[in-house]
Amino acid sequence: METLAATAHPDRFADRHLGPREAEIEAMLEAVGYASLDALSDAAVPEAIQLRRPLDLPDALSEAELLATLRGLSEENVEARSFIGMGYHGTVLPPVIQRNVLENPGWYTQYTPYQAEIAQGRLEALLNFQTVVSDLCGLPIANASLLDEGTAAAEAMSLFSGAHRGKRSRFVVDARCHPQTVAVVRMRAEPLGIAVDVTEAREATLGDDLIGVLVQYPTTDGEIVDYADLADRVHAVKGYVAAATDLLALTLIEAPGTWGADVALGSSQRFGVPMGYGGPHAAFFATTEKFARKIPGRIIGLSQDRHGAPALRMALQTREQHIRREKATSNICTAQVLLANIAGFYAVYHGPDGLTAIAEYVHGLTARLAAGLRAAGHAVAHDAFFDTLRVAPAGESGEGLVARAQEQHDINLRLYANGDVGVALDETVTDADLADLLDVFGGDLSEAEAEPGAGAMARTTDFLTHPTFSAYRSETEMLRYLKRLENKDLSLAHAMIPLGSCTMKLNATAEMMPVTFPGFAGLHPFAPLSQAEGYEEVLGSLEEWLGEITGFDAVSLQPNSGAMGEYTGLLTIRAYHAAQGDDRDVCLIPTSAHGTNPASAVMAGMTVVAVKVDDDGNVDLADLKARAEEHAPRLAALMITYPSTHGVFETTIQEMADVVHDAGGLVYMDGANLNAQVGLCRPGDFGMDVCHLNLHKTFAIPHGGGGPGMGPIGVVEKLAPFLPGHPVVPTGGEEAIGPVAAAPYGSALISLISWAYIAMMGPDGLKRASQIAILNANYMAKRLDGHYDVLYRGPSGLSAHEFILDVRPFQKAGVSAEDIAKRLIDYGFHAPTMSWPVAGTLMIEPTESEGKAELDRFCDAMIAIRTEIQEIELGQADAEDNVLNNAPHTLAEVSADDWTHAYPRSQAGFPTPEAAAHKVWPSVGRVDNAYGDRNLVCSCPPMEAYA
């Protein structure tokens, strides 16, 4: 019988992901002067580094095949009941939040809210989150989230060290902090020369070398400890106290700020966010007024717009890495906005009474469990607890009991090194679960009666008294509140977001769906590996695929942001040099680099030396050679972005690598611009030694309004032994550095999105995506050239996947880059990246997901704005009262009874037919950032502000 060839389904995902249709591709190629996509990419990418073979990846799956495959893999994971605790808990995500936030592109596709006028919805949501954290922690200032609890603790240590100007060297960590937190803090401390003393903090010797103390409250084994005396002793020697804590517990126990903590931090995961095998979850960080201008991460604050109305925006940005660079307080860039929003909405949904009721429910179950365990003859270590018990089993080893619980009941418990067993309860636990737990210990539910209570540490202060947390008790009201906030924000559901260096591509629905599969979402990160076989297959194959795409020999998925990828990559370089017996600590960084580069280098214990950039935007090769020669004995690394931050494939990239290698250093490549490389060239082939990959850029994880992100690193073979390890789950190389994230695989849950993207695009689709990204950028540059000056192009006259418009000449007419950015809002667009990497410019990156019609719509808007600028230049428009200076215009302003401007309402609010038909109106006028920084308000304002 004749064998039939396999038939591919005609509906290919790549055709859905890529914006332009074939006829549009041909038209754009003709406009830029190339006959084919291959001819275009051959001209853009230096010949010496081009990949001359297809990527060795599996053939593309259809969306249906992808979903079936991942559902099958999710079912290979065992959905056991995990009572392990250690900062990860079962939780109930309210369906109204799951459907309308987590699964809603109106919430997950935006970028960080740099354009506040079209981001008031998520800014309010983040202010809610900050208010929750501030109220529960009893501290006046909270940020808009950090990456995870471990890194938040490390940030607290760095904050305290900075307060002492680096003159103190000892940081005490209480031995009953979560082990992963201890390990992350130790890793952060070592390059900074800080000695970490892990001990019983209340018995530690405190002297004038003390930076501060970190405690867990309640402790990792569940005890509620009164740390007031410790705080007094620490403050007496001018040290500081950080408390890693639990938001749900804080509804019942005294706020850390009340007993003297200077910082309270932790994970908000149990406020509705699935465990997801470790992340992503929003960490929180609250502190005193003293540290308001040094706190790491983003802060949302209240200001006013040009009409004097209340308006929200990101506050105190001048302290951040993109401005302060190596002097920044932190390298934190992306945070966990989507997860912070979910946690904040969870608090809004339940309100203070509902949260307290949940906490009392959990604590009541725990008290009953403790009574039942004691009745069965077991020793429960502590009398004061919230949700976690430490048990010394009677008549059986802890190891045997834990194994039996897994085998007979699919129950996961924590095993301590001394044989004790840990049990942590949560809001998902039922009486049936309690009965099963007691059965494991040989107890009986009928004997599990006790009177719960927080004892001496019972909370005495109110929280969440703002009306927002009591106004939306019905689902109808909650739904409408979520929708009202969503409608204030521009997302990819409305228009392209052409932010340069941000790669705002499609986040396809099929890629997102597996995130909520129970077999993936419900897994505890410290569950036995035998229960995570589906995850192990996904994570293992993703590492292999990323290695093939980049040309590297090994990959670590642990870093949970691009900035942490930078930090991790530099730590592996540092560890390699140390293993060779070399004392190398100089990191060369071009002056055009993103601010996270120098900030990460300093965190990794390196000294930053700047390298000049020439007039064409390329690294000055002569200056690189001079700096490499000057610092050769101490040269650790060069950090380079490729294509460059100016959007150019530099032809000398291999020569740069040779210069550094010849001087004994290694080359770190910032992978922010990898979207122009996939399938066309591979960093590992042209001399790069380590590179981080922004999975939230190139590989389709959504930006979430400012997180989550994921920044895995790829390394050459000699660096593989130093990939980061973990104290609980074996990961990393033979000589692994310490962990850089709390969970062994970082934000494992969202790695599914990148796995799905690669699996559905296949090798041909991935290459075509890079080619169309380059085509779209060059087509737009061609259309705008002549209206604006396009800075920096390669030898062939082409940009890579992004390009820079010079708008500095318009300053003579009183028009700034900000004016153009705000005027674009009136046309229905989010602005490009503003004043980076060159002040007074706009950097545009369209990505491969936008079709020609949208590119033309944006170009038409930019050309129309150029005409408006010309009217000012020619005196045809008022120098002060003009559409640019007053942009953006709100619907309330345009429809008001009074109109006093020198231009018509139609020009203000309806500059094009498309803008008249559909756009996101700004809900506030231009925000006064300076006013907000002078008058810092970072929690929910009075209700009048929402009017």
PLM feature spans:
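Non-catalytic terminal extensions of PLP-dependent enzymes
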Residues: 2-31, 43-83, 92-108, 114-117, ...
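N-terminal export/assembly segments and adjacent metallocofactor-ligating motifs
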Residues: 112-122, 128-130, 143-147
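Conserved PLP-enzyme active-site core in the AAT-like
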Residues: 121, 151-311, 373, 377, ...
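A conserved hydrophobic secondary-structure block that centers on an alpha-helix together
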Residues: 132-150, 167, 171
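General small-molecule cofactor/ligand-binding pocket signal
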Residues: 142, 195-199, 381, 414, ...
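Core active-site phosphate/anionic-ligand binding loop and the adjoining beta-turn-alpha structural block
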Residues: 270-271, 280-350, 638, 696-769, ...
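Conserved phosphate/anionic-ligand binding catalytic regions in large, soluble enzymes, centered on
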Residues: 273-286, 290-291, 335-339, 424, ...
